[in-house]
């Protein structure tokens, strides 16, 4: 967690959900690290879109480092809510490949996710640990993924 109370965007501030922050702060997987969030930009580029679509909401930003998918799923289990809870895992999938190869690899990765296969490899997706953690959580909650776009 970043150790801040708000994330600022050109559209205004998004407050952190302090109830959820307090709910998971004691977990051994959780570390307060502003540096981890300073080096990562995936959330910042999505926040204005989320503000436009959702209006006012609270946020629990988690940067996932080197850990197991099960450890990520355990943290998600502590914050799993009802329909009011939106869990987003961000990935830009393959990197620095010729377009046709990237398309094929990204399609294969997407199929692994949709089929809830948890072994998305590091070389196939930036954020593979977080993706795999969400796959484990989806399996535990008997969810069925649906592809919106790729």
Please report, for each region that a protein language model flagged, where it lies by residue:
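Active-site histidine-anchored catalytic micro-motif
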Residues: 1-150
């Amino acid at each position: 967690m970043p150790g801040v109370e708000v994330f600022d965007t050109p559209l205004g501030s998004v407050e952190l959900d302090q109830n959820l922050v307090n709910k998971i702060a004691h977990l051994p997987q959780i570390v307060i690290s502003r540096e981890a969030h300073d080096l990562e930009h995936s959330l910042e580029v999505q926040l204005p879109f989320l503000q436009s679509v959702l209006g006012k909401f609270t946020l629990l930003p988690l940067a996932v480092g080197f850990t197991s998918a099960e450890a990520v799923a355990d943290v998600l289990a502590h914050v799993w809510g009802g329909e009011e809870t939106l869990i987003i895992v961000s990935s830009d999938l393959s990197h620095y490949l010729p377009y046709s190869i990237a398309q094929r690899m990204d399609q294969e990765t997407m199929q692994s996710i949709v089929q809830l296969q948890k072994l998305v490899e590091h070389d196939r997706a930036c954020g593979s640990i977080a993706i795999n953690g969400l796959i484990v959580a989806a399996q535990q909650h008997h969810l069925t993924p649906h592809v919106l776009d790729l």
